[in-house]
Regions:
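C-terminal structural segments of small proteins and small subunits
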Residues: 39-70
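Amphipathic, hydrophobic secondary-structure cores in small proteins
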Residues: 22, 28-48
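A general structural signal for well-ordered secondary-structure junctions
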Residues: 27-28, 53
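Short secondary-structure boundary micro-motifs
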Residues: 5-7, 15-16, 37-41, 49-51
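Intrinsic-disorder/low-complexity, polar/charged segments enriched in Ser/Thr/Lys/Arg/Asp/Glu/Gln
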Residues: 1-3, 29-31, 62-64
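Low-complexity, intrinsically disordered/propeptide-like segments
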Residues: 19, 33, 68-70
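An N-terminal amphipathic alpha-helical segment
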Residues: 1-26
């Protein structure tokens, strides 16, 4: 599973990092670590429009997002 650590970055950087990782490695599963609430919704929309399922788990001030290819 590939991982993108986008903690410390504000929108739209986390989404851009996810797009770059998917373009580079086309992973079956991608874990994304973020602390920018605005990124949750934008990454969720991106996932659905690009053939990935989406799960989000909030842990304090951070989120773990999991994108899995359909």
């Amino acid at each position: 599973m590939a991982t993108v650590d986008a903690r410390g970055f504000s929108c739209p950087v986390p989404l851009l990092m996810v797009q770059e990782e998917i373009k580079k490695s086309d992973p079956a599963e991608l874990e994304v670590l973020i602390d920018a609430p605005c990124a949750v919704e934008s990454i969720q929309r991106f996932a659905y429009h690009n053939g990935y399922t989406f799960r989000a788990e909030e842990k304090g001030d951070e989120w773990i997002l999991r994108l899995t290819k359909k």
